[in-house]
Amino acid sequence: MSFDLRTRLDARRTAHLYRQRPLLQSPQGPHVIVDGQPLLAFCNNDYMGLANHPEVIAAWQAGAERWGVGGGASHLVIGHSTPHHELEEALAELTGRPRALLFSNGYMANLGAVTALVGQGDTVLEDRLNHASLLDAGLLSGARFSRYLHNDAGSLNARLEKAVGDTLVVTDGVFSMDGDIADLPALAQAAKAKGAWLMVDDAHGFGPLGANGAGIVEHFGLSMEDVPVLVGTLGKSFGTSGAFVAGSEELIETLIQFARPYIYTTSQPPALACATLKSLQLLRSEHWRREHLASLIGQFRRGAEQLGLQLMDSFTPIQPIMIGDAGRALRLSQLLRERGLLVTAIRPPTVPAGSARLRVTLSAAHSEADVQLLLEALEQCYPLLDASESTEPVHA
């Protein structure tokens, strides 16, 4: 018996679900070169426009001169350097919590936190639309795992009634494919009433949300008692790479002792932490970035609604255009690309069957003119969906 990989791949192609990697040949930003083609991109997560900021680049260069280019060891051996520690302290200050702990990426942070906190005999309850890393973490934890209806505190309450052992309620802060935000006050109230802990992965909330960019917890004015476990990523609004968990002294010490994805990996380059310290400073001080981004979101939504496009209930930089059929979503993405715009088609299994969409993401680095170009292209391209066959584009 052998692995029949070709049949699996062919099935993906037939269902318009086959994925290919675009080759980015320029720095990240609104104006990019992909596979040799200049494009105006609306598909990255650089919400604050810091991924190519000259001060962040200079901080990385200076960090490399001072600290070298590699972490060299795991944090618990000799890989925890001064820049790592300073960044953890700055992230703790941003979130208003005693401690923060750096991870190499968001997947590892989520996996590490969930599996360190619950196991056999415990319960994990997750929103059914959570990010794949959270769902994987729940399954791999060994705890009893159940998903409640999307953003539905009543559905969560019904599952809390059946929970056993230590119970961890897990949700995205901003849902990455829909752009809506979790009803944290209701979820926190439900969790606390049953003695459960609430864990929030706010990967897409840090930066755009909150008066100081501290995310959805700041947006709702909640405390560490409401949300004991707060996760953030550094590869989106911070413009660099990595992730963190913020919480109490006891939580962070527990993760240091028991979070295997933290313990058994080499630390990120110290120079990267230097760059993130600079981007964090810019995120907190340059409030115009959040204000400009909010203005662009409003501009896009008004224009898209005038065109009759079906949007999701989102005031975040994630603005999906619902299409439904995967082939039609691919076709619209290709039509836009032919006009010099890059907007990714999102298809199953990333989203449920029948809910394929174009996922527009906006950045503080975009201009009003950029958004207007997108709206004009959508006005031209959307009617063409019914006038042509759905074909598989080169990339989507």
Swiss-Prot record:
The keyword Transferase applies. GO terms for biological process: biotin biosynthetic process. Transmembrane segments: none annotated. Pfam families: Aminotran_1_2. It catalyses: 6-carboxyhexanoyl-[ACP] + L-alanine + H(+) = (8S)-8-amino-7-oxononanoate + holo-[ACP] + CO2. The modification N6-(pyridoxal phosphate)lysine is found at K236. Its EC number is 2.3.1.47. Homodimer. Belongs to the class-II pyridoxal-phosphate-dependent aminotransferase family. BioF subfamily. Catalyzes the decarboxylative condensation of pimeloyl-[acyl-carrier protein] and L-alanine to produce 8-amino-7-oxononanoate (AON), [acyl-carrier protein], and carbon dioxide. This is 8-amino-7-oxononanoate synthase. It comes from Pseudomonas syringae pv. tomato (strain ATCC BAA-871 / DC3000). The gene is bioF.
